[in-house]
Amino acid sequence: MSRNNPPPVIITTDPDSPALHSAPSTPPPNQRPTPTLVIPGSPASESSHPESPQGNDPFRLSPNARLYPPGSGHSPTPSYSSALTPPSPTLTSSSSVHFSDELPTPSSPNPKTSLALRDNHPDARSGMETLQTVDENDPQRRHARGWSIGTWSSAAPTADGYSMKKPLIRTATGASEVDGDRGEDDANKKGKKDKKGKKGKKDKEEPPSAHLDPDKDKTDPTPFREKPSRLAMLVDPKSLEDLEKIGGVSGLLEGLGVDGEKGLAVGTDEGNAENGAPRSSADMPGGNGPQWRASMDRRRDIYGRNDLPRRKSKSLLLLMWLAFKDKVLILLSVAAVVSLALGLYQDLGTPPKIIYNDECPDGCEEAQVDWVEGVAIVVAIIIVVLVGSINDWQKERQFKKLNEKREDRNVKVIRGGSEMVINVKDVVVGDVCLLEPGEIIPVDGIFLRGHNVRCDESGATGESDAIKKFSYDECIKERDNLQPGQRQKKDCFLISGAKVLEGVGEYVVIAVGPTSFNGRIMMAMRGDADETPLQIKLNHLAELIAKLGGASGLLLFIALMIRFFVQLKTNPDRSANDKAQSFIQILIIAVTLVVVAVPEGLPLAVTLALAFATKRMTKQNLLVRVLGSCETMANATVVCTDKTGTLTQNEMTVVAGSLGVHGKFVKDLSDNASRSNANEGEGHSVHGDFSFDMSQLNDYASSSLQTLFNEAICINSTAFEDKNEEGKLNFVGSKTETALLRFAKDMEWPNYRQVRESAEIVQMIPFSSELKAMGVVVRKDDTYRLYLKGASEVLSNNCTRHVVVHQDGNKGDDIETTEFDDDTMSNISKTIIFYANQSLRTIALCYRDFESWPPAGTEKDGADEVPYEAIAKDMTLIAITGIEDPLRPGVREAVEKCQLAGVAVKMCTGDNVLTARSIASQCGIFTAGGVVMEGPLFRKLSDSDRLEIAPRLQILARSSPEDKRLLVKTLKSMGEVVGVTGDGTNDGPALKLANVGFAMGIAGTEVAKEASDIILMDDSFKNIVLAIMWGRCVNDSVKKFLQFQISVNITAVFITFISAVASSSEESVLTAVQLLWVNLIMDTFAALALATDPATESSLDRKPDRKNAPLITVEMFKMIMVQAIYQIIVCLVLHFAGLKILGLEDNDQNNTELGALVFNCFVFCQIFNQLNCRRLDRKLNVLEGFWRNWYFIIIFLIMVGGQILIVEVGGAAFQVTRLGGRDWGITLVIGALSLPIGALVRLTPTGPFARLLVKLHIYADPNKLPELSPEAEEEQYSYNPALSRVKDNLSTYARIRGGRLRASSMVAKSRNAQLRDADIQFPSLLTMVPTVIAGTVGAGAHWVTPHNSIGLSNPAGQDPSYSTAELFKGKVQLHPRTNPDDPLYAKFGLQPPESRGSSVSGAEGLSSGDANNV
């Protein structure tokens, strides 16, 4: 075998395996050629299909790279079709992903599955949209979650900087288009025109091409063999022929300069190697060609980086231009320019006026300052636009950083012969990457080897099947052996964006970044983020306020114009310039009123609040993926949390165990004697048990037993050792597996790497939640051995023997085993219970030997593997290990805070009841009235029982992801706002279904993260409390700003309107420039100040708001109205009676001073009211947390300083004059009075205001009872078929009895048996008798549990104190402190605590006998 062309390594024991036979390069003459997808523009597209001489092959693609739908006229051959099924990432009973290879036949044209992409016949299997590119106008492409199928999903609120008319290929000189046109990106050019001089909008709207054309790719691949586009086209469409043309996998590896087993040759600086010392290129096997010596940078230059090009950010100038394009501002700008022109003409084109006063008794010229107002308005507009644009620019930068953080993740690769963890962006073409369950494949690749790898490609291609991956050689063999009419099934292609459902394997990367399948789709889907629910609410409110403000402005303009026309008659002496100036003043004041009334700061406030919140949340290990989730968490009522890693530290360590059955080992036995259940005294001791320290385990186990124990741990594991960021070696993988590997390392047994490399693996059984176990079959000389590890109570049932150790330490070299007996089974059960009650996770390790493979009497399934059920029996138990996962610090306090905030916490865990209840009791989750139940039982409940149990269910043990999803669905149907944590691939549906999904940042799979809204980067439950706090902080910030702005709006509109209409000169007491300054204060400055308050724990002191709660609460409404009325009264009194109150004469100087005083009082009322609006509750301390918010302090000082400068030096620009000490004193007193008035409002009872608002129909009646949705009401009575029939009969009975009975909801007509409206005959009523009896019996028997005999599942008979988790199947537990009169006791036939005559212990330190069981 040539050294330059190493063969792929295929692990198989089947002599007929396709891997052991070479495939001919051409198919047999009698074989039907494999149908191929015709690429638009390629030579093949001009010719006919091999089997379609007329050129009407139904499998051809249309010229625009889209599939012809059946019956479209392009496809004369009938096409098979089936209902399209929405993609599902899970394999539950309700999943759309199934393992089936059923083919369509004329007799069965609708198969259960669609194998479109796999056999290259998309429309023959209803895969019409498999390769259809997403249209950029499709609303779904803008969805923040629904289309998030890959690594680069983005919710940044920026416009699309890419049009992707042609896919980009990274070359040595930069990004270029694949057709070899100019190297610049035409999509970024604005205003480009076609030959007719029109902008090419049509081209911009077309979706990007779904295919690449290698013939137009001018990229020079030297030193590699293949161009980037040619490699990318291997998977789009999947083409085994194209792969064969480049030499198959061996030719591909040779062309890329990579070893199929040891990966790329790199130096030690390319990542964290498994052993810290990857081999150099000189040590690597392979060729000596230039491609073998190419650097990583060279690979990136040719094939690109695994990172999508950054979207073009809007510059500050562009944001300013977009802000200035507001129609109202444009109108105001036009008016300001006209005013400036008239002012300049007045000042420069006309002689100055001569005025006489005390200072100028002989007369002097009036100052030429008419131009100042126009300039001031222009400057004010510029400031408003500039400040708003800077805010948007800063917000965009924050979201950009957030997206960069969110897109960051690690992947496992093989480089230099060692496994290492690198950043996903560092993956290059040629890398050998590892596949693991739950991973979202980040790049395109070709499968090399693996065990039972199945992928869900529905999210990437619409393919609804779970597709198993095979090696290239197996695919070639299948193709060459196809009979006429058969289609290719086996697939070796891996598509980016697909999800690994199960299995482990390796693949070589062939396309990354924008050239990958998913990369091109993600580039096409780029767009602005959707608005959050709160933004939508505020936009509606802002639109309403703007309409009212616009109506006020229009009404003011009409009123002033009427006065203007009247004065044309009554005062004809005015010059034309005066008339024009007066008209412009009317227009300016009306437009300015509209500017002030339009609350453009409302959307800004929520955006700023979200931007600041998400930035600070990221620093606190909360990565927000969907902005709306922040708002939703504010009103969360239930949190369904995992146990492992969320409530506990997820740093598992083996602290106790049982070697065989009798040898109980404990870590640090002298300090932890209570962790051994051996010789615990009379009534608890088990004959033959003995304890020893874990460090002495090698003294009690023979060398053969040590080897067996070590192999059971090391071979049956996917974890490995790696260097962390600090350069220290640690284990990477499942926490349970890493704990066992660390245990083996502490025992100083042979290194796991050596053990794995020496093992010849025949079959692997990956872990699944259904099996609750994982295993591996290895060949040992002429025999085969199965190693299994998993849940102890599950695997113990499958064992019939156990290893034997002796207390005296005498041992030989052989492994001694013995049969199970009744005492042994009881011992194992009590050991499991003992460990579980100490919150230890129990893992059993066992093995079984076979003489041949497959074993006699068994057959391999369709996947060429022996079924698990056929071999997982009659095993020998090696050991049961107790793994400790201590509680995270502060978890109990966090649970208490949730409960204080009105958020119920429910634990959903896969652990047994005893462990789950112990942890829940320590955390404070299991409280009086709480219910404990197992997942299988909860799943079997009727809808009505589930609705009754769900609110009180606190622990759902042994639950599957489907159970968690069902619980979430039930809670949501009851109107709860549900948050859910998840870390596994199968948690995806529950995370999607929940109102807010939390994924684990450390232990979570990529599928879980992709389905989530928020990622807990440190997997801690405490961060869920932080999310609630920040969510309420965002909502509170927006409400604070809303309370402030509406009061300013009302005051400004009333004062301006009344003073302008009452003025003889059509002038408002607040000029246009002054109103623009007020607008700047109430929109931008207030949004920055009030939307940046940090989250505080005081927000947890209240219950969550209802879903239909109004945006403006009664307290807010009360404060808004009182403050607005106070400010209107003060300002209007000063305006109309100020001269008399202050004892001033009526002249121009005093009027100007009075106008400045009114303006100053108005502004300082807003400044002090801004302080007042920092609180929404009835507490009086408005300065709480004031000194912690630097934004508020700085903006408060800017507003005060700016107002002082305006009054003191603003002069003619703001039409004010300097104020004396008395006036400043009046200003500060009037402004500061807002604070005591606010305190008085808070002390005023809310009841009268609430009743008034209800009578005015502004608010809904809070005393009105909530109603169930029609769906929930129907489900309420569908739990028992007998009672459904009773309901039908009661409906009939109500026709005769009527009245009171008819008022009951029980008499609603059943959807199961609708009755006619005709009269019912009396004999029909007799049907009530049997159905009522049946209903009573059915309801009573619904919870009856059959008697369990003594055995492993129930070793103590009916005594629950000594029961394993198996005992609780079909049972319900209540907390011992539950009220004895609780109706659940009677409903489920439970025995209240005191009736048993036993004392009731507290929730803490609960023993297995403290709970009530059925």
Curated annotation (Swiss-Prot):
Please tell me where Ca(2+) 1 binds in this chain: V595, E600, N1079, D1083
Per UniProt, Ca(2+) 2 binds at N1049, D1083, E1208
Q: Which residues lie on this side of the membrane: Cytoplasmic?
A: 1-327, 392-541, 607-1040, 1090-1118, 1172-1191, 1245-1414
Observed phenotype of the null mutant = Increases cytosolic free calcium level. Resistance to cadmium. Decreases cell population growth in serum. Sensitive to calcium. Abnormal level of calcineurin-mediated signaling pathway gene RNA, transepithelial migration gene RNA, and antioxidant gene RNA. Decreases VCX1 RNA level and increases ECA1 RNA level during cellular response to calcium. Decreases urease activity. Avirulence in a mouse systemic model of infection; decreases lung fungal burden and abolishes brain fungal burden.
Q: Spell out the Basic and acidic residues composition-biased ranges.
A: 179-189, 202-229
* Classification via Gene3D superfamilies: Calcium-transporting ATPase, cytoplasmic domain N, Calcium-transporting ATPase, cytoplasmic transduction domain A, Calcium-transporting ATPase, transmembrane domain, HAD superfamily/HAD-like
Q: How does it sit in the membrane?
A: Multi-pass membrane protein
What is the enzyme's main class? translocase
Query: What's a single GO MF annotation on this record?
Result: P-type calcium transporter activity
* EC numbers, comma separated: 7.2.2.10
Can you list the GO cellular component terms from the UniProt entry? plasma membrane; vacuolar membrane
Note down the stretches annotated as region Disordered.
1-231, 265-294, 1376-1414
Q: Please state the span of the N-terminal signal peptide per the UniProt entry.
A: none
Bilayer-spanning residue ranges = 328-348, 371-391, 542-562, 586-606, 1041-1061, 1069-1089, 1119-1139, 1154-1171, 1192-1212, 1224-1244
Q: Which reaction does it catalyse?
A: Ca(2+)(in) + ATP + H2O = Ca(2+)(out) + ADP + phosphate + H(+)
Q: Which InterPro entries match?
A: ATPase_P-typ_cation-transptr_C, ATPase_P-typ_cation-transptr_N, ATPase_P-typ_cyto_dom_N, ATPase_P-typ_P_site, ATPase_P-typ_TM_dom_sf, ATPase_P-typ_transduc_dom_A_sf, HAD-like_sf, HAD_sf
Q: Which residues bind ATP?
A: T644, E737, R779, T909, G910, D911, R958, K964, N986
Keywords annotated in UniProt: ATP-binding, Calcium, Calcium transport, Ion transport, Magnesium, Membrane, Metal-binding, Nucleotide-binding, Translocase, Transmembrane, Transmembrane helix, Transport, Vacuole
List locations, semicolon-separated.
Answer: Vacuole membrane
Superkingdom of the source species: Eukaryota
Low complexity biased stretches: 33-53, 75-96
Family per similarity comment: Belongs to the cation transport ATPase (P-type) (TC 3.A.3) family.
- What is the role of this chain? This magnesium-dependent enzyme catalyzes the hydrolysis of ATP coupled with the transport of calcium. Transports calcium to the vacuole and participates in the control of cytosolic free calcium.
Q: Which NCBIfam families match?
A: ATPase-IIB_Ca, ATPase_P-type
Q: What is this protein called?
A: Calcium-transporting ATPase 2
Could you tell me which species this protein originates from? Answer: Cryptococcus neoformans var. grubii serotype A (strain H99 / ATCC 208821 / CBS 10515 / FGSC 9487)
Gene name, Swiss-Prot/TrEMBL:
PMC1
